[in-house]
Amino acid sequence: MKTPKMNVESFNLDHTKVKAPYVRIADRKKGVNGDLIVKYDVRFKQPNKDHMDMPSLHSLEHLVAEIIRNHASYVIDWSPMGCQTGFYLTVLNHDNYTEILEILEKTMQDVLKATEVPASNEKQCGWAANHTLEGAQNLARAFLDKRAEWSEVGV
């Protein structure tokens, strides 16, 4: 039975056919003024087989959201997937996949050098007790270890 087309791009992705980790272009939108928004699916864990624990995911979200902007001014957002298998990276007016891979690599290398999770306090975070620098660094290290596979989505 054919699955009906959904409005959300990721709901149309056959999650049984992908091979994490990977980075893929999930969507492109052209604005009425000509701006281009590109959303990347940055998958760390194999869907329906593995997931990131919440404190590690939460800490990696904070670290990457802060650090990636040191490498790219066109980043709009870095947000976690509810399924806890990856993140979405959204950029403005930038459509160079190879450069995105490079800034992700640099960012993950910087995560490994971090000495604290940024904004992991009650004033700046809604769940400040839910962080682990070590867990975030383990996720970044595992992702970097598979750098050669990031372009192999499997679909």
Swiss-Prot record:
Q: How is the cofactor bound?
A: Binds 1 Fe cation per subunit.
Q: Where does Fe cation bind?
A: 58, 62, 125
Q: Which domain of life is it from?
A: Bacteria
Name its co-factor(s): Fe cation
GO terms of biological process kind: quorum sensing
Alphabetically list the UniProt keywords: Autoinducer synthesis, Iron, Lyase, Metal-binding, Quorum sensing
**What EC number(s) does its UniProt record assign?**
4.4.1.21
Its recorded reaction(s) are: S-(5-deoxy-D-ribos-5-yl)-L-homocysteine = (S)-4,5-dihydroxypentane-2,3-dione + L-homocysteine
Q: Name one GO molecular function term.
A: S-ribosylhomocysteine lyase activity
What is known about what this protein does?
Involved in the synthesis of autoinducer 2 (AI-2) which is secreted by bacteria and is used to communicate both the cell density and the metabolic potential of the environment. The regulation of gene expression in response to changes in cell density is called quorum sensing. Catalyzes the transformation of S-ribosylhomocysteine (RHC) to homocysteine (HC) and 4,5-dihydroxy-2,3-pentadione (DPD).
User: Record's PANTHER family?
Assistant: S-RIBOSYLHOMOCYSTEINE LYASE
**Family, per the entry?**
Belongs to the LuxS family.
Tell me which HAMAP family the record gives: LuxS (MF_00091)
Q: What is this protein called?
A: S-ribosylhomocysteine lyase
Q: Which organism is it from?
A: Helicobacter pylori (strain Shi470)
Q: Which gene encodes it?
A: luxS
